[in-house]
Amino acid sequence: VLLIIAILGCVQDTHGQELVVNGSFEDHSKCPRSVAPNKLKGISNVRSVASSPTYFNSCSQVVGVPQNWAGHQTAKDGEGYMGMVLTSQNGDRTDRQYVQLELKEPLQNGHRYAVSFWVNAADGSGYVTDRIGACFTTMDRSRKGVLHDLIGKPDLENPLDRFLSDTTAWMKVDGTYNAKGGERFLIVGNFQRYGYSSRKAMIPNSGNSVLANVESNYLEMNDPDPDRGRFLRALSKQAYCLLDEVSVVPLGSNVSVDLLTQERACAI
């Protein structure tokens, strides 16, 4: 039997296909109503791990976009974004927050993926840092909030000394990830230990001093909302950033080759 090896056009081209579900945080069933953490309830396919970030959306009067208790910033894409603590100058060295996003399908072993997200330093943040990254995982870490095995091992990280200090423009963090296979979730946050998390005062006391204890101008505000005032005081000792437009895109395509027998060829 004559066998003709032919490409039948069965090409599975995934190049350019966005894999992150709700990466711009637009799909939500509830409008955020409070500064207090709420475990990101009502935001489709987005979860917190351990301490909860804050969801900002233009539909809210308290945590709105562009104006909110953390400052003023338009979204990179759409009407919403996340706010998260990366590191802190106060006594709690574990004071940080993480956002977990779900992928449309598991990553494939040996395949390469373009990973990117956009960050912006909140106006009210007392400090800035260069430490933010991303980790892929096969498990849903939001259930138990366990991340200790990922600390010090980010799959993607912002370059050292590239401080996330821009309060106006969004800064892009990107790179390429070689998948192990089976990864279904992406977690964004600071994956370095406290001692490896550089911090600089947003408004240094003198020169370019590091770890200067700067009280934010927000403390001078006579805010009638006690919760908001409490968060503003905490913000003055934190490196707090905004997060938007998280993306994972496959690089290249897969081409499947099939066998074309003489019988199949005649049937076409």
Give the positions of each predicted feature.
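Bacterial Sec-dependent N-terminal signal peptides
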Residues: 1-20
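Aromatic (Trp/Tyr/Phe) and Gly/Pro-enriched flexible surface segments
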Residues: 17-109, 118, 129-131, 146-265
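Extended, low-complexity, turn-rich repeat/linker tracts enriched in Gly/Pro/Ser/Thr and Asp/Glu
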Residues: 120-128, 140
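Beta-strand signatures of extracellular beta-sandwich domains
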Residues: 133-135
